[in-house]
Amino acid sequence: MKRLLVACCFLSGLISASALADASTDLQNRLSKVNSFHASFSQAVTSSDGAVVQEGEGELWVKRPNLFNWHMTSPDESVLISDGETLWFYNPFVEQATATWLKNATGNTPFMLITRNNPDDWKQYNVKQKGDDFELTPKSASGNLKQFAISVTPSGTIKSFTAVEQDGQRSAYTLKSQQSSVVDASKFTFTPPKGVTLDDQR
């Protein structure tokens, strides 16, 4: 009887590991079906006690694996652009831009996970699936990300994603009007405007 219980536990562990692997593979396969897209988004940031910290909206352009333009239009404008080599962050209000190497950007942030869709990045997470909804938990608790959830259709359309930090703060993004089409290359280039202070960390 004891041997049977041990065998059942072992088999259950194998099935669970297989399910996690299948969920991760399915998520990667779905994301890989759309190589470039444009969408508008809304943002809602809440604290651990549910209080609204910030609400905003903006536009997003992506061309996988390493090109993206994240343009927050409200409440305050900011731009995050990758040209494939350099990651640019621009804040028009304070007239400051920061440049860092994209290769040094961490792969454990939700946005980098979505835009890169790199198998090595996904290996750092346990992935559970329920229909179109995927829940990711970091295998290492050393980072600031506690949990990440994303909803993706079988055709590769991202409907929403949510990041929960270790302190309980939740950032939820809902994508709408997503268009899977070729994005103009100019969306992925950035030149600091005249008068802007550049913090070049490359």
UniProtKB/Swiss-Prot annotation:
Assembly and oligomerization: Monomer.
InterPro entries, per database record: LolA/LolB/LppX (IPR029046), OM_lipoprot_carrier_LolA-like (IPR004564), OM_lipoprot_carrier_LolA_Pbac (IPR018323)
Signal peptide: 1-21
PANTHER family documented for this protein: OUTER-MEMBRANE LIPOPROTEIN CARRIER PROTEIN
Gene: lolA
Keyword 4Fe-4S: no
Family: Belongs to the LolA family.
Chief location category: periplasm
Keywords: Chaperone, Periplasm, Protein transport, Signal, Transport
Domain of life: Bacteria
Purpose: Participates in the translocation of lipoproteins from the inner membrane to the outer membrane. Only forms a complex with a lipoprotein if the residue after the N-terminal Cys is not an aspartate (The Asp acts as a targeting signal to indicate that the lipoprotein should stay in the inner membrane).
Subcellular location: Periplasm
Protein name, UniProt field: Outer-membrane lipoprotein carrier protein
GO biological process: lipoprotein localization to outer membrane; lipoprotein transport
